Amino acid sequence: MFVSFTVAKYSGRNILFGFLSMAIFRILFFLKNYGVVFSKLMGSGKNGTFDIEPDLKQWAYMWVWKSEEHYENFEKKSWVMKYIRRFSTEKFTLFLKPLQSHGLWDGKNPFETNEKENFGDNETIVVLTRASIRIHKAADFWRNVPAIAKNFAQHEGFLYSIGVGEMPFFKQATLSVWQNETFMKAFAYRRKEHSVVIQKTRSQQWYSEELFARFRLIGHTGNVPVSISDL
């Protein structure tokens, strides 16, 4: 299994093409699949943060592929990539290998793997968390979770994160990159504010569906953030 996560930024008159990509890419993949087994086209929060205000200049495209070869063929030949290269001002792609995943996304676990691998002591780890928020719990979610997400950057071992969503307000996700698993776990399980919110999501049943996945970063291309450019 091979996963690509692309972030593309559009500016000026081309901002409209970022917005239109949400519909156009669905049509293009319907016409030719290129070996995609799971696809998510998502907007992002303001400046890429986990914010209720959208950032119309930045869009994220996540695809799960049958193999790396299928992605390479897509990269070279697809109209989707030609579109991104033509209209975006900058873009980067992270290449990921799922190692651990539990939960559901649209009724399935797209990152489920039978491989049993652990992360090395100093190996970069990429984490994706996503949830479908119950309508009557949305206010509770937006009062609590964004503040926690903003604490990412203040925590030791943090490298990068982006808040994204496939449906405004109700279907949200965060992708974050950490120096290693130890730093990630320290934030997720030992930081008091984060633990309290996690307990609320469960006891108050904020989500109708959720998923948590960990990936190995196996490569990247494009204008990657400086914090992860040397990985």
Where are these regions (language model features)?
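Short S/T/G/P-rich N-terminal loop/turn motif that feeds into the first structured element of a domain
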Residues: 1-59, 68-74, 86-173, 183-190, ...
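Extended hydrophobic/aromatic segments used for targeting, binding, or gating
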Residues: 186-187, 191-209
